[in-house]
Amino acid sequence: MEIIFGRNKKEQLEPLRATVTGSIPAWLQGTLLRNGPGMHTVGDSKYNHWFDGLALLHSFSIRDGEVFYRSKYLQSDTYNANIEANRIVVSEFGTMAYPDPCKNIFSKAFSYLSHTIPDFTDNCLINIMKCGEDFYATTETNYIRKIDPQTLETLEKVDYRKYVAVNLATSHPHYDEAGNVLNMGTSIADKGGTKYVMFKIPATAPGSKKKGKNPLKHSEVFCSIPSRSLLSPSYYHSFGVTENYVVFLEQPFKLDILKMATAYMRGVSWASCMTFCKEDKTYIHIIDQKTRKPVPTKFYTDPMVVFHHVNAYEEDGCVLFDVIAYEDNSLYQLFYLANLNKDFEEKSRLTSVPTLRRFAVPLHVDKDAEVGSNLVKVSSTTATALKEKDDHVYCQPEVLYEGLELPRINYAHNGKPYRYIFAAEVQWSPVPTKILKYDVLTKSSLKWSEESCWPAEPLFVPTPGAKDEDDGVILSAIISTDPQKLPFLLILDAKSFTELARASVDVDMHLDLHGLFIPDAGWNAVKQTPAKTQEDENSDHPTGLTAPGLGHGENDFTAGHGGKSL
């Protein structure tokens, strides 16, 4: 696996024309912008975990049937400090950078003290977020980095803490029809409490539609949920939204804050301070978007680890939400670089297969309902919600599919009933070998695969004016374990899952994580969404935080990114 994981990737600073085979639809005009780890060693020092690698941005610009590729390392403070020192000097989640051995005892003592409450990295390697007219590389810390989506130049550094009190934040925000951003973060021991903070960033600065105004300055707290534990908050990678509610899972995959505070002096990584508590429950929080308060009923399910929400919607008095769930945290453990050897593809095995699970949460619980009765009256799912003696509700999911990750949908259906999921098929190994189209209605699937090929997260781009949910194309950056085979951008017909075209490039491409598609200038997001009602037209601040036309609870500025992801 040296070709994929063990070798630093080279930048392609100038646009490189790809060799296109097949026919690219004439309407497909824009830039696929992706993010992921590309550098795993600096000098003689090595990162411990694949998710620690320095961020490498890359893009495929599609114009009139031609494709141009470029890539560039994110010029973060972390990157610059490491390169200048020729070693890793900034800690990542799985790699603790140690003090200079030449420092005297007083300098070392000060370093230990300064790391008690760590200033996290700005190595934003996970996703791309659109905020107003700007694009940002994101990670799961309080920092994001503004970038130029065309040149891939790194611009200013933004600290969420200047606007909202969060130490950590997700890389999978949601968007409403106006382009407002909804995201979540964790505020650690703020004013004596640890809480999960939902915050909203307006699409434009209030009172001005002029370009250049920073909407981040006008961020507001949408809702706060106290952590069940002051010193052991839940780790979460994403969340879900419907037209009227927000879905947040407080799962028993936890951060031990005391251990994190002493990690530096103990010489261990922050990742070692994460614990999966298999005896604990997963608590389901449903937040009303209108009142901005959680539904008072206590919902829970069995212990699980969820990285990616797929979608959520309301039906017959219930919130239905779909997630990719694991029985444990083995996925994260497998990607330590020590495990990514030549036998990784054959020998790496998850101890729990990622499953697509559908939960149904009743919005109104009959106090007179019998204990043990199923409160779900939705005919479209076998998921149950059982009333218990203490008025808690135990939710059991319907398992829809086994062996998939990195889910995307047509974001025009985010927060609404939907039918299709586009994902990478992974089964018991974390290696993505196929692209999957899954129909949640018929439970049928279509797949694309090719020998020695590893596909990245598949991104759906709808045909302009499309009426069918799957009328569009799938874009996926494909790398190969065969050094003789060039990497390429794959373009599939989303309906039939047949190949329309591929654009091969003779570059050292990395396996990326998440990203978005930016249509060419002139595209109007509002025109690509269903017509607004009169009530919507009269509201300057719509409460429905769904985003037809945008990304996967993430960010796909296609004419039409699926539900959110990693």
Curated annotation (Swiss-Prot):
Location(s), subcellular: Cytoplasm, Cytosol
Note on cofactor: Binds 1 Fe(2+) ion per subunit.
Principal cellular location given in the protein's record: cytoplasm
Cofactor or coenzyme needed: Fe(2+)
Pathway(s): Cofactor metabolism; retinol metabolism
Family recorded in the similarity comment: Belongs to the carotenoid oxygenase family.
Name assigned to this protein: Beta,beta-carotene 15,15'-dioxygenase
Gene responsible for this protein: Bco1
